[in-house]
Regions:
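Coiled-coil heptad-register positions
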Residues: 65, 69-72, 76, 146, ...
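Intrinsically disordered, low-complexity linkers and terminal tails enriched in Pro/Gly
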Residues: 1-9, 90, 177-182
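Negatively charged, low-complexity tracts enriched in Asp/Glu with abundant Ser/Thr
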Residues: 8, 26-79, 174, 178
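Long, compositionally biased, intrinsically disordered regions
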Residues: 2-25
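Helical coiled-coil/dimerization "stalks"
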Residues: 80-88, 165-182
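Amphipathic, interaction-prone secondary-structure segments
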Residues: 66-101
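Intrinsically disordered, low-complexity regulatory segments enriched in Ser/Thr/Pro
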Residues: 95-137
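Amphipathic alpha-helical coiled-coil segments
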Residues: 54-64, 68, 124, 128-152, ...
């Protein structure tokens, strides 16, 4: 990545946008740990707990995204031709997307186009860049946690079905007269 010289850095000082800092993530880090992800799960309860932990983490990340959106819903960002919005997906999660106000077109291309326009004030370029980095990071974190939680919930259900089949077979063996194990 190309380094900016001192004059460019001075002209592009960040001002209106405050990116999320490590302290914003600390509560999420301490609320649930995924270090137990790589272990031999003994049953559907442990997987269901992992799915619940992921759901709590995802909600925490979405709250951080709300804080980000609150910033961009204030001037000077409300004067720009594009805005950052929430988009709910069919997979029942939410991501941050750029949307052009006039055309409703969405995507990172809208952000890039806004950055290239001479109408976009130079003093906002650093803020817009930091917003995009924050958007990318939060979307990645939300996606990962959502996927892990979804997989954990599906596996918990499959383990529950396997247990039901197993228990059904054991009960069948116990009720059958003269049944002998193999």
């Amino acid at each position: 990545m190309r380094q900016l010289d001192k004059n460019q850095q001075g002209a592009l000082q960040q001002s209106a946008f405050r990116p999320l800092q490590q302290t914003a993530f600390q509560a999420l880090q301490h609320s649930a740990s995924l270090k137990g992800l790589l272990k031999p799960f003994k049953g559907n309860r442990e997987l269901a707990q992992l799915a619940e932990q992921c759901e709590v983490l995802e909600q925490g990340l979405l709250e951080l995204a709300q804080g980000l959106l609150a910033q961009v819903r204030r001037p000077p960002f409300t004067l720009l031709p594009a805005r950052l919005i929430e988009q709910r997906t069919s997979a029942r999660t939410t991501f941050l997307r750029w949307q052009h106000i006039a055309t409703r077109r969405m995507g990172v291309g809208v952000w890039a186009e806004m950055l290239r326009q001479d109408k976009t004030p130079e003093y906002l370029l650093q803020d817009l860049y930091q917003m995009e980095l924050q958007r990318i990071t939060l979307n990645m974190q939300i996606s990962l946690i959502h996927s892990i939680g979804k997989q954990a919930a599906e596996c918990a259900e499959k383990m529950g079905q396997a247990e039901a089949e197993f228990m059904g077979r054991l009960q069948q063996s116990q009720t059958r007269p003269g049944s002998v194990g193999m």
